[in-house]
């Protein structure tokens, strides 16, 4: 595979994302390509895309193009919230994620942890549309009704687990790529079930939206492996959330710092 440079990747993305009424701007300071269409904006971090390209080849670029196209398609469509309660889900994002749209519409959110925040979205099949507070009034629905519907729908999603073990420490991965892998962190019944199953300390991570990691940590090696794993996923994710794992105790999630082969207390 030929060496991919920032300029080559920028040109390739512009070519594959070219469309009528679509503009591009490039920020050389942070190597970011911004795509604008009908007032909607998507910013792509070129270095991150190149890193994914080096691992996955053309599939990494195809995935980016797909997400951008579906995102613009979802933003352009009118979503009727009233008849879509069965398609509403909670979505986990970093606390730094914007709480309003570029047009100034406030998004429907709930607090979660010091690192994460809950947003709500209408599933559109291949993408989803974040719910704005103004949509509630139009649909004559309350925040609580949306929250209840979203969490009920989340509880009905399957949770297939893949397991890996390192020196007696077990790691479970949820990676369905349905857009709600990280959201399964919000499934309280699932967390309680896993807590009963695990024998060590239960530590979870949502480095990006398309993965949930659950560690059954027995020793410092387990913490070390989880720390490196979380950082790797965080760097590779299209929608990063947080590089900090969470300890799950007594029904609560507490962010912790892990460095090298030692665990630092929360």
From Swiss-Prot:
Domain of life from the UniProt record: Bacteria
Entry's transmembrane regions: none
Homology family: Belongs to the UPF0354 family.
Name of the featured protein: UPF0354 protein lmo1608
Organism whose genome encodes this protein: Listeria monocytogenes serovar 1/2a (strain ATCC BAA-679 / EGD-e)
């Amino acid at each position: 595979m030929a060496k991919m440079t920032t300029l080559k990747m920028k040109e390739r993305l512009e070519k594959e994302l070219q469309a009528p009424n679509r503009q591009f701007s490039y920020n050389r300071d942070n190597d970011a390509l911004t795509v604008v269409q009908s007032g909607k904006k998507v910013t792509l971090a070129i270095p991150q895309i190149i890193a994914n390209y080096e691992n996955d080849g053309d599939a990494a670029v195809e995935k980016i193009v797909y997400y951008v196209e579906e995102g613009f398609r979802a933003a352009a469509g009118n979503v009727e919230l009233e008849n879509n309660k069965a398609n509403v889900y909670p979505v986990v994002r970093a606390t730094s994620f914007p709480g309003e749209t570029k047009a100034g519409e406030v998004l429907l959110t709930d607090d979660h942890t010091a690192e994460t925040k809950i947003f709500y979205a209408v599933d559109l099949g291949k993408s989803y549309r974040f719910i704005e507070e103004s949509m509630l009034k139009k649909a004559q629905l309350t925040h609580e009704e949306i929250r209840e519907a979203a969490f009920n729908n989340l509880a009905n999603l399957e949770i297939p687990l893949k397991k890996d073990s390192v020196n007696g420490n077990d790691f479970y991965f949820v990676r369905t790529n349905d857009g709600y892998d990280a959201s399964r962190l919000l499934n309280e019944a699932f967390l309680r079930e896993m807590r009963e199953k695990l024998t060590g300390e239960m530590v979870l991570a949502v480095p990006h939206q398309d993965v949930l990691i659950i560690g059954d940590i027995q020793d410092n090696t387990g913490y070390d492996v989880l720390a490196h794993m979380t950082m790797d996923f965080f760097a590779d994710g299209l929608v990063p959330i947080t590089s900090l794992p969470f300890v799950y105790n007594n029904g609560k999630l507490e962010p912790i710092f892990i460095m090298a082969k030692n665990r630092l207390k929360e």
